[in-house]
């Protein structure tokens, strides 16, 4: 008899969350646990948030904004990024047009030091406090590290801005060299939940990325780690990813949304619905109440202008301005005007040192 009733009533299929079954509302729980006490939602609670119906979205975003203001404050950190080495990467990240294994239109190219300095100057003019040097590699070789060192020295001589790097997986010796160069923050994304990672990358493991991040923290650099939503992961795996990040406890989490690139294995995937993307933004804020949560790639195609505004009023407290590595972003002026319209102050450089 129990089997019959179980088959007739599946709470998840009927859109009923465990919180509703237990007679508690997950947003009420989050208000007391996260907003009042600063304790992030666990994996099961985050899943309940992701399963909320669309009619609860505004309430969810409002609560996430309150949490962000309570535990992070009103300031928004602005960052620009530049690709030092583009394309020709030996890894097979299925979302990435920079892989040399796929028939994408992106070709390998290097940027010289004067171009790096000019990009840093233009980034600083927007009010950004962070400039991130990125390279499409499995990990840096000696040539790349020498170019990074020369670029950092030249930038420091001419631009008052903090420098971050994203150069793939590192050895312990490479981590220390970057720290000695004065790299403020290191980005290395886990990309997705541990259980879903083999569907995204097969040429290296999730654990290899995790090891790099731990070495970065031990060397005294800030850890920046996020990923891409909308690569075919389930809501359960999205909640798992938030829990993975909460365990890592990075200083910053960049949230990207898949922008399907021609020639890649994920090139034909559908763009994530805006409501799902916004629920994820709010859910990650409730799971990571004190973490810098940054709007990154794909938000233009996924959310548009209105969605970007809702995200900044729904838990986001950092943005990448200008273009991304291989795709166009919003004009920096548009993001800066949006922050001004929302009366969100840009974090000052001296407040982040």
From Swiss-Prot:
* Recorded phenotype for the gene knockout or disruption: The deletion mutant is unable to grow without extrabacterial biotin.
Q: Which reaction does it catalyse?
A: (4R,5S)-dethiobiotin + (sulfur carrier)-SH + 2 reduced [2Fe-2S]-[ferredoxin] + 2 S-adenosyl-L-methionine = (sulfur carrier)-H + biotin + 2 5'-deoxyadenosine + 2 L-methionine + 2 oxidized [2Fe-2S]-[ferredoxin]
Give a yes or no for keyword Endoplasmic reticulum in this entry.
Answer: no
Record-annotated Radical SAM core domain positions: 74-299
Q: Where does [2Fe-2S] cluster bind?
A: 132, 165, 224, 294
The record's keywords, sorted A to Z, are: 2Fe-2S, 4Fe-4S, Biotin biosynthesis, Iron, Iron-sulfur, Metal-binding, S-adenosyl-L-methionine, Transferase
What Enzyme Commission number(s) apply to this enzyme? Answer: 2.8.1.6
Q: What GO molecular functions are on record for this protein? A: 2 iron, 2 sulfur cluster binding; 4 iron, 4 sulfur cluster binding; biotin synthase activity; iron ion binding
Positions of [4Fe-4S] cluster binding: 89, 93, 96
Could you provide one GO biological process annotation from this protein's UniProt record? biotin biosynthetic process
Locate the coiled-coil region(s) and give their ranges: none
Give the cofactor note: Binds 1 [4Fe-4S] cluster. The cluster is coordinated with 3 cysteines and an exchangeable S-adenosyl-L-methionine.
PROSITE patterns in alphabetical order:
RADICAL_SAM
| Activity regulation (record text) | Requires the biotin synthase auxiliary protein BsaP for activity.
The pathway this protein participates in, as annotated, is: Cofactor biosynthesis; biotin biosynthesis; biotin from 7,8-diaminononanoate: step 2/2
Cofactors that this protein relies on: [4Fe-4S] cluster; [2Fe-2S] cluster
* Annotated function: Catalyzes the conversion of dethiobiotin (DTB) to biotin by the insertion of a sulfur atom into dethiobiotin via a radical-based mechanism.
The family assignment reads:
Belongs to the radical SAM superfamily. Biotin synthase family.
Record's subunit section: Homodimer.
HAMAP family reported in the protein's UniProt record: BioB
Name it. Answer: Biotin synthase
Gene symbol? bioB
């Amino acid at each position: 008899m129990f089997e019959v009733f179980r088959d007739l009533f599946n709470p998840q299929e009927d859109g009923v969350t465990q919180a509703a079954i237990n007679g508690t509302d997950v947003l009420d729980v989050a208000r007391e646990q996260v907003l009042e006490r600063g304790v992030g939602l666990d994996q099961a609670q985050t899943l309940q948030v992701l399963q909320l119906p669309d009619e609860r979205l505004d309430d969810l975003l409002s609560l996430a904004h309150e949490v962000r203001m309570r535990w992070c404050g009103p300031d928004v950190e602005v960052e620009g990024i530049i690709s030092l080495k583009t394309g020709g990467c030996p890894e097979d990240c299925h979302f990435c047009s920079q892989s040399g294994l796929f028939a994408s239109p992106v070709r390998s190219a290097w940027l010289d030091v004067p171009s790096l300095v000019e990009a840093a100057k233009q980034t600083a003019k927007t009010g950004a406090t962070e400039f991130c040097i990125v390279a499409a590699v499995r990990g840096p070789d000696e040539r790349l590290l020498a170019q990074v060192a020369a670029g950092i020295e030249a930038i420091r001589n001419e631009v008052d801005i903090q420098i971050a790097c994203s150069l793939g997986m590192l050895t312990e010796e490479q981590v220390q060299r970057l720290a000695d160069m004065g790299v403020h923050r290191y980005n290395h994304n886990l990309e997705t939940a541990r259980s879903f990672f083999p569907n995204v990358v097969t040429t290296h493991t999730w654990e290899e990325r995790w090891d790099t991040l731990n070495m970065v923290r031990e060397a005294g650099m800030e850890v920046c780690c996020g990923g891409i939503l909308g690569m075919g992961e389930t809501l359960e795996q999205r909640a798992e990813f938030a829990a993975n990040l909460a365990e890592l406890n990075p200083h910053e989490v960049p949230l990207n949304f898949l922008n399907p690139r021609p020639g890649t294995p994920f090139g034909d995937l559908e763009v994530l619905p805006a409501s799902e993307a916004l629920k994820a933004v709010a859910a990650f804020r409730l799971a990571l109440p004190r973490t810098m949560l940054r709007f990154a790639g794909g938000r233009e195609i996924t959310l548009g202008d209105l969605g970007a505004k809702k995200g900044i009023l729904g838990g986001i407290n950092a943005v990448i301005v200008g273009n991304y590595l291989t795709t166009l972003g919003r004009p920096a002026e548009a993001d800066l005007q949006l922050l001004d319209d929302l009366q969100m102050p840009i974090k000052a450089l001296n407040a982040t040192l």
